[in-house]
């Protein structure tokens, strides 16, 4: 009997052993491999591939034409823009087997990766970081960082709401949308006063 706690379009392929949480939706022509885990209230767009043993948290949105390969982990509330790219081997060759050389990639809670961005394997994208469209990310990204360009460079900082933060001389900033307070210390930003009901 089909589990009706989540929705799967008739054209999608869900392999035996895949786990999908309640309230999630899987759309046209998507393929979810065995032993993958998808959390609750996720939206998996059209033509998405989710590899074996991939772990996806709750509230994740994956737009069309994205492949999430082995070694990639997506925490809660991550957003993946259309046609963004993950990798899992640093030096692939068609004639050399490197399935034991996958380098893990972690996309932390609330991070956004824009359309057509590329994330090289073996790095971490920090909480609530925002990767701009078309950026090529080759190194670990700190929380709340705004990354643009090729190669990707930090060009600013953003709030949880994805709004650019403007820091004063004391390294203090407020999100104009949420009112949350942030503190810049060296090359790190921390959320010092979250909105009511939110975690810092």
Question: Which role fits each region the language model picked out?
Answer:
Residues 159, 175-178:
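Short cysteine-rich clusters marking metal-coordination/redox-active sites
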Residues 170-175, 187-192:
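Short cysteine/histidine-rich zinc-coordinating motifs and their immediately flanking basic loops
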Residues 167-169, 181-186:
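Short, non-ligating residues that shape and space the ligands of small metal-coordination modules
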Residues 2-5, 10, 16-18, 25-125, ...:
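Flexible, glycine/small-residue-enriched loop-and-beta-strand segment within the central core
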Residues 192-200:
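Short, intrinsically disordered terminal segments enriched in charged and Pro/Gly residues
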Residues 143-149, 158-167:
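Short, intrinsically disordered, charge-biased short linear motifs at domain edges
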Residues 137-140:
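Signature of the chemotaxis receptor cytoplasmic signaling rod
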Residues 154-157, 173:
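Cys/His-enriched microdomains
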């Amino acid at each position: 009997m089909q589990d009706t706690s989540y929705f799967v379009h008739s054209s999608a392929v869900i392999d035996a052993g895949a786990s999908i949480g309640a309230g999630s939706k899987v759309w046209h022509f998507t393929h979810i491999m065995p032993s993958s885990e998808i959390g609750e209230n996720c939206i998996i767009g059209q033509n998405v591939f989710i590899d074996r043993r991939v772990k996806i948290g709750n509230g994740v949105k994956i737009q069309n034409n994205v492949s999430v390969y082995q070694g990639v982990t997506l925490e809660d509330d991550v957003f993946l823009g259309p046609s963004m790219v993950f990798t899992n081997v640093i030096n692939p060759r068609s004639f050399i087997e490197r399935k034991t050389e996958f380098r893990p990639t972690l996309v932390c809670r609330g991070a956004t990766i824009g359309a057509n961005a590329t994330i090289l394997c073996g790095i971490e994208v920090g909480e609530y970081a925002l990767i701009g469209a078309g950026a090529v990310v080759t190194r670990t990204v700190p929380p709340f960082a705004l990354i643009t360009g090729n190669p990707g460079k930090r060009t600013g900082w953003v709030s949880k709401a994805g709004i650019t933060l403007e820091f004063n001389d004391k390294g203090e900033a407020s999100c104009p949308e949420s009112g949350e307070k942030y503190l810049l210390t060296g090359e790190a930003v921390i959320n010092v006063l979250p909105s009511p009901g939110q975690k810092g």
